[in-house]
Amino acid sequence: MDKRKACTRTTVGAACAIFVLTACLCAQEAPAWKPFDFDEASRNIPKPREIWPLVREHTVPLEFEIRSDEIVSSDTDPSKKLRKVTAHFYSQELAGKKWGHPCVIFTPEDNRRNLTPERKGKVVIVGSPGRDYFDVHVDKYGEPIAAKTAYPTMVLSNPGRYPDGSDVERDIGILSTLRKQTGKNYYNMNCQLAVVYIQAMNAFQQFLGLDDLNAVVGGHSKRGRSATVAAAIDPRVGSVIIMGNEGVYATDRIQWHLSFHHAFFQDQVDVPVFYIGATNEDGYKMFNVNIMQERLRRPMTIEMIPNYCHSNFSEIQFMDFMMCVAHVFDGRPLSRISEVGHQRQQGRTIFRARIESEAKIQVAKTWYVYTDDPAWRDLMWYHLLMRKVGDHYEATLSGKIPDAFMVEVGDIAMGFPGYVSSTPQKLTDAPVIERRSRGSLPRLWEPSE
């Protein structure tokens, strides 16, 4: 035998043996890497219903006080008279300070209709920021909803005021301070503002002299996200309306605020949830609303307001809030958008969607956008009218394919107009980064030096 060949075979055989032995030793010494198991890691994270007994300890007596009570002509329908009550109550005490809540309640002048079995206990609660925002919410949400639906409606300041008159919202960082001092993660805006809603239902129930309520509860941003927490805790919440705030939780780690994300505790929320967002939403990644929707077994009804920002003064918000109330309490039908898609054909983009509705469809639009900003901030969305083609609606755009599009439907039923939309659909590989938070200020705004 050739000695060189024998040596080669021996060397290779020895190397293989060493490799196998080394691999076996490594397998014994270091366990195989496993991907992060979010479901397992989050199994014992408490949800709102389990946390409530701890949070409840901070609640205080309502001390509900009526400060004015008058009959007024409705601005929305001057033929109607409304009872307008200005009141105040307390919800909780944190860091030695009570949270107080100015509120305005509207009912029909003659409220006997709301004592009938089919209407008894049905109420609307709108969470509002304080200061100048509050009066706008009274005039644009509270009074029109009460006038047109005839359901008792409360607009309250949430998170409210301290006894010295200063705004809790300007001091909302106290929750982060308390969390760090105590190690208790339930100090969270979505939790403490939910307590406000629960106490508001107690105050409303006391005012109306009822044994139970069925409340549509909602508001903008944290005032909306906290309403889902209230729904998980309190069965009196019959529906939730969220206006803006597209925060999502990570699934590659456990974040301290996980307990208060709707998708995480969705098994505790058995009511319809409406999301009224905006294409220029602040501080979140574009398309986060898609993640929010995909994680829910019971999808939200969505309206993404084109070319609007993180704020709560859009006419569509006023309109859709009332539409949601009419849907939940009186069965006002909603349009449903499905099978949203597109096709490239001879230099054109054809947009399609199936739209089903028992309401009268007044307009169907495709909204599309081109982006030159990875944050997708301050972009202009343009629309195309869609027309019925067979069992779908279609619109065609010639030229370059957009970076994203969505479908929106405007309809009317039972005298209540409204809008719903699909989630935005991404069409290209345009980058997407998290937006730098600027509230409702534009991308090019900078603070003064």
Identify the residue ranges that each predicted region occupies.
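Catalytic histidine neighborhood in serine/cysteine hydrolases
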Residues: 296-312
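Short glycine-enriched nucleophile-adjacent loop
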Residues: 224-235
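Cap/lid segment of the alpha/beta-hydrolase catalytic domain
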Residues: 127-134, 144-195, 249-254
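The feature captures the conserved acid-bearing segment of alpha/beta-hydrolase catalytic domains
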Residues: 249-297
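N-terminal cap/lid segment of alpha/beta-hydrolase-fold proteins
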Residues: 57-117
